[in-house]
């Protein structure tokens, strides 16, 4: 099966883990006499959108860590299409979403991966914001009181 790279591919209209495509690292390593003892590919995913059970849209940023000594990696366009298809499935929690991504990518590339949540959500503040709506001060031509100097 050929991957989606370089081809026009319709955006999935349902959850589509089958769109994931592996890339063998053998071609890049062949005749290079490389030995991998450590290293990792890190994929930062800045736009992961998903729905919870109440159909509330959530946004997270995740980081996928694939060991450099894995036999396969995931083709980037197929990963992007897969991630976009997540919006068609409901998840109980971020943990369930991460577990789902992890399971499908690990099955594809035949190795264990690590996924981190790299998005730090801002806590809502209970402080009141006071807005001054007094616009009575109109600067005169030679009035420099409204000029900020650095």
Where do the language-model regions lie?
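N-terminal intrinsically disordered, cationic/polar leader segments
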Residues: 1-150
